[in-house]
C-alpha cells in the first residue's frame, strides 16, 4: 500500500509517526491530510529514509535542493559533497538533476548517502542518451518515457517530476502566444520538442494510467511538472500557465483515485504582487494538492543574487500557502552551482521557509524565535549560533571583530541591552 492508502485505512506507517513527532502534531491530523491528498509523504518502498518529510497543508514549509552534473562539469565526488552540504544546512529533500556522466551511478550514489527523500526528472536520462547517440535531445521512443520511470523507481527515487500537463492543445497555444520565453522548463522543452518532432501527444499524458501503476507499485510521489511556467516576470500569470494547470487538476484527480500521492509544481518568475494570486489559484484549481514552487523569483535582474530574490518570493509564497520551496543558488541562470553555491542557496531558502512558518503561526517556529530572543537578552553567543540558520557565517563574523567584554564590537559600552539591564 501507498502512504495515502495506509492513511485512508486509518492506520499509521513508521514514517507517519516520525513526521508527527518532528511536526509536533497529532498523528490523526497527519493521517487525514495524507488520506485526502492535502499532504504527501515521499518515500519509495525501496529507500530507507532517516529523515522523512511531510509536505502539505498545515505543516512546516519544506526546502528542496537541486544537485546534479552537466556536460561541462560531471564529478560524482563533487555532487556527493553537494548532497552532504545541502543536508547539513537543512535541506528537507534533494533532487538529482544530472544530465551527463553515468546517470544511474550518480543517482544511486546520492540515494545511498542521503538521509532525506530524493527526487529526479526521468526524462533527462532519455534526452542525454539520445544526444550521445544521435546529437539530438528528442530522438527517442515512446517506450523510453515509461522505461526511464521504472528505472528510477527501481533505484529508490522517492518523488519524480513528470511533465504530463503539456498536451498538444496547450503546446499549440503557447507556440502561437505572445510569450517572450515560450518554454523555460528543461524537461518541458524536451517533451515539447519530442511532441513537435513526432507530431504525437505527450506520452506522459497519454499513458498516465500506466504511469500511475508504476508509481503505486513503488509508492512514488508524482510531482506534476509545470512545463509552462513563466521564465520572465513579463510572461507571468498568462493563459498558457493556467491552461496547463487545469490539465494538472485532471491528473491530480486520477492519481488520488488510484491511491497515488501527487503534488503540483509551480512558477517560476512571478512579480511580488502576483504571488498571492498564483498560490491561491494553484490550491483552488489543484484541489488543495501540495504546492512545490521554484523560487518564485520576483525579478529577472538579480543574476548572481538570485538566491536572495528567491528568498523574498519564497517567504511570501510560503505565507500564502506554498508548501515546498525549491531553492535557487547564486549561480542560477549563469552556471552549474558550486558546493558553496549549494550552501548559500539552502540557507536563503531555509530563511524564507522560517519566515513563512512564523507568519503562518507555527508553534515550533515561534518557540525557536523565543529561544533566540532569550539568548540575545542573556548574551548567550553559543546558543545564538546554534539557533541561527547561517550559523557558520555568524560565528565567523563574531570572531573576525571580537569584543573583549559582554556584548559585541558594534556597540561596545553603548549596548542597548546592557543599558536597559543596568537601569530598568
Swiss-Prot record:
The keyword rRNA processing does not apply. Pathway: Cofactor biosynthesis; thiamine diphosphate biosynthesis. Pfam families: ThiC_Rad_SAM (PF01964). It comes from the Bacteria. Binds 1 [4Fe-4S] cluster per subunit. The cluster is coordinated with 3 cysteines and an exchangeable S-adenosyl-L-methionine. It catalyses: 5-amino-1-(5-phospho-beta-D-ribosyl)imidazole + S-adenosyl-L-methionine = 4-amino-2-methyl-5-(phosphooxymethyl)pyrimidine + CO + 5'-deoxyadenosine + formate + L-methionine + 3 H(+). Its cofactor is [4Fe-4S] cluster. [4Fe-4S] cluster binds at residues 408, 411, 415. The keyword Metal-binding applies. InterPro entries: ThiC, ThiC/Bza_core_dom, ThiC/BzaA/B. Keywords: 4Fe-4S, Iron, Iron-sulfur, Lyase, Metal-binding, S-adenosyl-L-methionine, Thiamine biosynthesis, Zinc. One of its GO terms (biological process) is thiamine biosynthetic process. Its EC number is 4.1.99.17. Belongs to the ThiC family. HAMAP family: ThiC. NCBIfam families: PRK13352.1, thiC. This is Phosphomethylpyrimidine synthase. It comes from Pseudothermotoga lettingae (strain ATCC BAA-301 / DSM 14385 / NBRC 107922 / TMO) (Thermotoga lettingae). The lineage of its organism: Bacteria, Thermotogati, Thermotogota, Thermotogae, Thermotogales. The gene is thiC.
Amino acid at each position: 500500500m501507498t502512504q495515502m492508502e495506509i492513511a485512508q485505512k486509518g492506520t499509521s506507517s513508521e514514517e507517519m509517526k516520525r513526521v508527527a513527532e518532528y511536526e509536533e502534531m497529532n498523528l490523526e491530523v497527519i493521517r487525514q491530510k495524507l488520506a485526502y491528498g492535502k499532504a504527501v509523504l515521499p518515500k519509495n518502498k525501496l529507500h530507507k529514509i532517516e529523515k522523512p518529510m511531510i509536505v502539505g497543508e498545515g505543516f512546516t514549509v519544506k526546502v528542496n535542493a537541486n544537485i546534479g552534473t552537466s556536460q561541462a562539469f560531471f564529478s560524482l565526488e563533487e555532487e556527493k559533497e553537494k548532497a552532504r552540504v545541502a543536508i547539513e544546512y537543512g535541506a528537507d529533500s534533494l533532487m538529482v538533476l544530472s544530465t551527463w556522466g553515468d546517470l544511474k551511478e550518480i543517482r544511486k550514489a546520492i540515494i545511498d548517502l542521503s538521509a532525506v527523500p530524493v527526487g529526479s526528472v526521468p526524462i533527462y536520462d532519455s534526452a542525454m542518451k539520445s544526444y550521445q547517440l544521435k546529437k539530438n535531445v528528442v530522438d527517442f521512443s515512446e517506450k523510453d518515457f515509461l522505461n526511464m520511470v521504472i528505472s528510477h523507481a527501481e533505484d529508490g527515487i522517492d518523488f519524480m517530476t513528470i511533465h504530463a500537463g503539456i498536451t498538444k492543445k496547450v503546446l499549440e497555444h503557447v507556440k502561437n502566444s505572445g510569450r517572450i520565453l515560450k518554454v523555460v522548463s528543461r524537461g518541458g522543452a524536451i517533451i515539447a520538442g519530442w511532441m513537435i518532432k513526432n507530431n504525437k501527444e505527450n506520452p506522459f499524458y497519454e499513458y498516465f494510467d500506466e504511469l500511475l501503476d508504476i508509481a503505486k507499485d513503488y509508492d512514488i510521489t508524482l510531482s506534476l511538472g509545470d512545463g509552462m511556467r513563466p521564465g520572465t516576470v513579463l510572461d507571468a500569470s498568462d493563459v498558457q500557465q493556467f491552461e496547463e494547470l487545469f490539465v494538472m487538476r485532471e491528473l491530480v484527480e486520477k492519481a488520488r483515485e488510484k491511491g497515488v500521492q501527487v503534488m503540483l509544481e509551480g512558477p517560476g518568475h512571478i512579480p511580488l504582487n502576483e504571488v498571492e494570486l498564483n498560490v491561491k489559484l494553484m490550491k483552488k484549481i489543484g484541489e488543495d494538492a501540495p504546492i512545490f514552487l521554484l523560487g518564485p523569483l520576483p525579478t529577472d535582474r538579480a543574476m548572481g543574487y538570485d538566491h536572495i530574490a528567491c528568498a523574498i518570493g519564497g517567504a511570501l509564497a510560503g505565507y500564502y500557502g506554498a508548501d515546498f520551496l525549491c531553492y535557487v543558488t547564486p549561480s542560477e541562470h549563469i552556471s552549474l552551482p558550486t558546493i558553496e553555491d549549494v550552501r548559500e542557496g539552502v540557507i536563503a531558502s531555509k530563511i524564507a521557509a522560517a519566515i513563512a512558518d512564523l507568519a503562518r503561526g507555527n508553534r515550533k517556529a515561534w518557540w525557536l524565535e523565543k529561544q533566540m530572543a532569550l539568548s540575545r537578552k542573556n548574551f548567550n553567543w553559543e546558543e545564538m549560533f546554534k539557533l541561527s540558520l547561517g550559523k557558520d557565517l555568524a560565528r565567523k563574523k563574531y570572531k573576525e571583530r571580537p569584543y573583549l567584554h559582554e556584548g559585541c564590537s558594534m556597540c561596545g559600552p553603548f549596548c542597548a541591552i546592557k543599558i536597559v539591564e543596568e537601569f530598568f
